[in-house]
Amino acid sequence: MSWLQVIVLAVVQGLTEFLPVSSSGHLAIVSRVFFDDDAGASFTAVTQLGTEVAVLVYFARDIGRIATAWFRGLRNPGRRDADYRLGWYVIIGTIPIGVIGLLLKDEIRTAARNLWAIAIALIVFSAVIAAAEYFGRQVRHVEQLTWRDGVIVGVAQCLALLPGVSRSGATISAGLFLGLDRELAARFGFLLAIPAVFASGLFSLPDAFAPVGEGMSATGPQLLVATVIAFVVGFAAVAWFLRFLVRHGMYWFVGYRVVLGVVVLILLSTGVVAAI
């Protein structure tokens, strides 16, 4: 992997990780179209560590408050507030993707990264996002979250294992279908992603240095630089996206996903780019 590839893919990762457009799908598309190869699932997982650190920094106060409330609630049942419960919902919501991710790790690294599958997922899941925006009542706030919300949004997060779906798109859509307001749906989804993405990144770290049969390999310094770039770009992206989401919703991204999916299908149909 050249340094140009590293920089371009890191910027793509940072820009798209928090948008409902699928960062893993974009990395696969950009890699194939411009560099005639796939960055690989391991490179994707490791660079996601940079964007998740960006989430940690951006939501540091929220995370600190939730963690404090959770430990306080364990010691003193009389002080179990909404933040204490939110801590449990994040834990509960992380379980599904942990189990499914381990069971399907081989498929995620290979078959699911086919550009035909990614293009179709981009288009099909656009309908889900649009439906969530249209039917979501957005009347529930953090005090009204329940363990059921944690389970459902956690299960929805499993869809992010398929490139082309989008983690934020899946979790925010699930939250909207459950009646959560847009900002809560986004914040809860981002918090839910932190343990899952960190576990995935650390698990994939050894493979990222020498992926066999799954794409371009990156050196240690390249992975470090890519992760730092993804952090910087990702921090700016999450700050912008939350403001944009509250004001405008996700319809703009629905249109973008459909256009991108159609373009990729055309490139595949005409033989301009290979599916795998």
UniProtKB/Swiss-Prot annotation:
EC number: 3.6.1.27
UniProt keyword list: Antibiotic resistance, Cell membrane, Cell shape, Cell wall biogenesis/degradation, Hydrolase, Membrane, Peptidoglycan synthesis, Transmembrane, Transmembrane helix
Annotated TM spans: 1-21, 39-59, 84-104, 115-135, 159-179, 190-210, 222-242, 253-273
Cellular compartments annotated: Cell membrane
A Gene Ontology cellular-component term: plasma membrane
Pfam families documented for this protein: BacA (PF02673)
One Gene Ontology molecular-function label: undecaprenyl-diphosphatase activity
Catalytic activity: di-trans,octa-cis-undecaprenyl diphosphate + H2O = di-trans,octa-cis-undecaprenyl phosphate + phosphate + H(+)
Primary localization: membrane
Lipid bilayer topology: Multi-pass membrane protein
GO biological process: cell wall organization; peptidoglycan biosynthetic process; regulation of cell shape; response to antibiotic
InterPro entries: UppP (IPR003824)
Record carries keyword Amino-acid biosynthesis: no
Signal sequence, start to end: none
Described function: Catalyzes the dephosphorylation of undecaprenyl diphosphate (UPP). Confers resistance to bacitracin.
HAMAP family assigned to the protein according to its UniProt record, in alphabetical order: Undec_diphosphatase (MF_01006)
Family: Belongs to the UppP family.
Remarks, miscellaneous: Bacitracin is thought to be involved in the inhibition of peptidoglycan synthesis by sequestering undecaprenyl diphosphate, thereby reducing the pool of lipid carrier available.
Protein name stated in the entry: Undecaprenyl-diphosphatase
Organism, as annotated: Mycobacterium sp. (strain KMS)
UniProt lineage: Bacteria, Bacillati, Actinomycetota, Actinomycetes, Mycobacteriales
